[in-house]
Amino acid sequence: MHERRLNILLRPAALLYGLVAAVRNALFDRGMLKAWKSPIPVVSIGNLTAGGTGKTPLVDWVLKYYLSIGCRPAVVSRGYGRRSKGVQLVSDGRNILLGSTRSGDETAMLAANNPEAVVVVAEQRSEGVQFIMERFRGERPDVIILDDAFQHRQLARDLDIVVINSREPFAAAKMLPEGRLREPKSGIGRADVAVLSKITDESKADAIEAELTGSVALVARTRVVIGELSPFGPKGRSTAPHPDPAGLKALAFAGIASPASFVESLMKKGVHVVEQRFFRDHEPYTLNNFLPLVEEARRKGLTLVTTEKDRYRLEGEPGLLEKTEGVGCCCLNIATGFTRGAEKLQEMLKAVVRD
């Protein structure tokens, strides 16, 4: 009943949000608002809904693909959760220059996992691209990947990829703030590629694909590739080898949009999740919210287990990990794998830099 009343209160704001988004899209579609065309090829990876689609692992996959074929890619991201403003150079492709507090947790993770890529954060993606063109004038990247930029239409793109969470593909078709849609569902028609993520029901994925057929050139499907548990701790303290996940007793914690997927992945690895504690997506860790986790884990003999992006957020906060003396900490590494459409997507990505 409370949720229903809240939805009724939020509905006028959602209607206004949807109207503004629709008018804005119409102005771009009719050429009344112009998009700036970068001389460097641009690939955009985004979504229709707010949070929790598996977009960041796909950005990582695309980065690694371009590096594997000898290209020099760059990423421009907003840098959600960062404590900095304007355009910031996170990595120049040789050295990582900023930590997670000034770059954002996801951006810090992308830079660390792809050290040869240029990584920039900017509220306005076009400003980030222009910065790259000036800063790397003599050695410009071959391609720029826009992270979470489907709605950022001021910057033209050569390939538009939208990630769709197949568990809740269009978040019950309700606009923000009543639901999670950032724009009307019809916006999917601007995309070249739709990537279905978090598939648990193939028949539901089939139905989504059938609905999208004709609107996009390719509908691809992904799966979560569950990696190792990687131990971490304060700099200078030796960490234990990779723990055996089978039977590991854990206090699982994270500040992400879809914590249920994280817990499911831990359980698939054989981790015994004894306790769970979750925070808002990108919420900063402080002594006030992290120390209770450490104390509970120490008291109950549990290992602290979190996500890779939460690890980078923790490592960016001076002094926090020093409080974990006597308590094991590790993060679960995940990646994107494809069950359908990988080769076709690679062809499309290659065509962007070839043309």
From Swiss-Prot:
SUPFAM superfamilies: P-loop containing nucleoside triphosphate hydrolases. It comes from the Bacteria. ATP binds at T49, A50, G51, G52, T53, G54, K55, T56. InterPro entries: LpxK, P-loop_NTPase. Pathway: Glycolipid biosynthesis; lipid IV(A) biosynthesis; lipid IV(A) from (3R)-3-hydroxytetradecanoyl-[acyl-carrier-protein] and UDP-N-acetyl-alpha-D-glucosamine: step 6/6. Coiled coil: none annotated. It catalyses: a lipid A disaccharide + ATP = a lipid IVA + ADP + H(+). One of its GO terms (cellular component) is plasma membrane. It holds the Pfam family LpxK. Keywords: ATP-binding, Kinase, Lipid A biosynthesis, Lipid biosynthesis, Lipid metabolism, Nucleotide-binding, Transferase. One of its GO terms (biological process) is lipid A biosynthetic process. Transfers the gamma-phosphate of ATP to the 4'-position of a tetraacyldisaccharide 1-phosphate intermediate (termed DS-1-P) to form tetraacyldisaccharide 1,4'-bis-phosphate (lipid IVA). Belongs to the LpxK family. HAMAP family: LpxK. This is Tetraacyldisaccharide 4'-kinase. It comes from Chlorobium luteolum (strain DSM 273 / BCRC 81028 / 2530). The lineage of its organism: Bacteria, Pseudomonadati, Chlorobiota, Chlorobiia, Chlorobiales.
